[in-house]
Curated annotation (Swiss-Prot):
It is found in: Cytoplasm. SMART domains: rADc. Belongs to the class I-like SAM-binding methyltransferase superfamily. rRNA adenine N(6)-methyltransferase family. RsmA subfamily. This is Ribosomal RNA small subunit methyltransferase A. One of its GO terms (molecular function) is RNA binding. It catalyses: adenosine(1518)/adenosine(1519) in 16S rRNA + 4 S-adenosyl-L-methionine = N(6)-dimethyladenosine(1518)/N(6)-dimethyladenosine(1519) in 16S rRNA + 4 S-adenosyl-L-homocysteine + 4 H(+). Gene3D superfamilies: Ribosomal RNA adenine dimethylase-like, domain 2, Vaccinia Virus protein VP39. Specifically dimethylates two adjacent adenosines (A1518 and A1519) in the loop of a conserved hairpin near the 3'-end of 16S rRNA in the 30S particle. May play a critical role in biogenesis of 30S subunits.
Amino acid sequence: MDLANPGALKALMAQYGLRPQHRLGQNFLIDGRVLDGIVSAAGLEPTDVVLEIGPGLGTLTQRLAAKAGRVVCVELDRGLVQVLHDTVQKAYDNVEVIHGDAGRIDLHKLLGERLAPGQKAKVVANLPYYITTPLVMRLLEEELPLSHVVVMVQKEVADRMVSPPGSKAYGALSVAVQYYTEPRIVLRVSRASFMPQPEVDSAVVSLRYRERPPVDAPPEAFFRVVRAAFGQRRKSLVNALTSLGVEKAAVHAALEAAGIDPGRRGESLSLEEFAAVARTLWQRT
């Protein structure tokens, strides 16, 4: 059964007495071209271990299972877990379905038990929109054994991930994503590619992990500066960074030493400039 077929999907849901749960962001992808594009972007090999978050009814899972060595699905909705057990897990011996909350489950343990020594997994998923940003940040910050993330996200979130300094969409998420990975938008996806249709369009993003950060600064100091700068976007840097508990005069001196105009705002700074501020500020405190 091709689960990307709308008729088959409706019949399957009726068979199990299920309806899409809006509170869980359940919009099922039914566009075969987009599904194939996601799998292609992940560049799957027969030895790959894939973590799929929010597999829904298994439309993407089918295609992942045909390409990867192992697919581990984490699904929050108990009703969908039963469907996944009866369909994709029984049809593919390389699929494992886990009932759990991807925002809380111990991903280090989950992946560590399924990877060979030195191996890294890939995350490939159509993410529920209500958890996109915190989940992506978790995948970035927790030093998980991951090499590549390919996910469907809300169009506006995708734009934020790849936005350059000075653009309207540039923010703390942009900096974090570009610090840890090399991001690119793979596909723009119409809301008509889903059932039921969401209220927004989407995009598929590829986040390939860097071997090392692109800038030289202590990570904790770097991200403290970033959070402070974007936490009060309308304020100048010299005023926003005082929220770090540093005297305004010391902030002013650190900015000037880094070659940064104290009157600039956080959204105008590049990663290298944030790193320069972090280095000079922490040398003076």
